[in-house]
Amino acid sequence: LLCLLANSLLAVCSAGRRVVHGFDSGFIEQFNEKKMSGETNLSILIKSMQPMLQEGDYVFASVKDIKLLNLDEVLFYFREKEEITVVIKREYADVMQLSYNYISAWITLNIHSSLEAVGLTAAFAGALAQDGISCNVVAAFYHDHIFVARTDAVKAMESLLKLSAKSNS
């Protein structure tokens, strides 16, 4: 029974290519390549980054047990050796009585940047630093996300838009 199951899931074509659930491995590789490929050209990344300010206030907090939180309310979490850092909406942190000391705005760069792209973080972090703005960056699968102090949100957007416009000229 196990062999029949294995043969139905994974077969070998006459060309020697694997077939998984009826899809040729070449198709799967092309699909994954297209899905995985984001932009790597720095000048294109900068001029096309399209920063977007998300609604709401976000905070960084830490918890010992992530299971105590509703994961639908967690924007992201990262397991550190001390505890688990979570980024969540400020309102939810207040409801859960979590302590925080940094209220941030969330800016998403709407270009699909490759995780292998070189220089994008340095470029926008440098532009923000020149304007005296601290940033905390999360590189996710499709986009880069920037957290800046809530009080710096408008100034950060202006700085990012200026960087992008300068790259377009």
Task: Give the positions of each predicted feature.
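Regulatory modules associated with amino-acid/nitrogen control
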Residues: 32-126, 161, 166-167
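Helix N-cap motif at beta-to-alpha junctions
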Residues: 90-93, 149-154
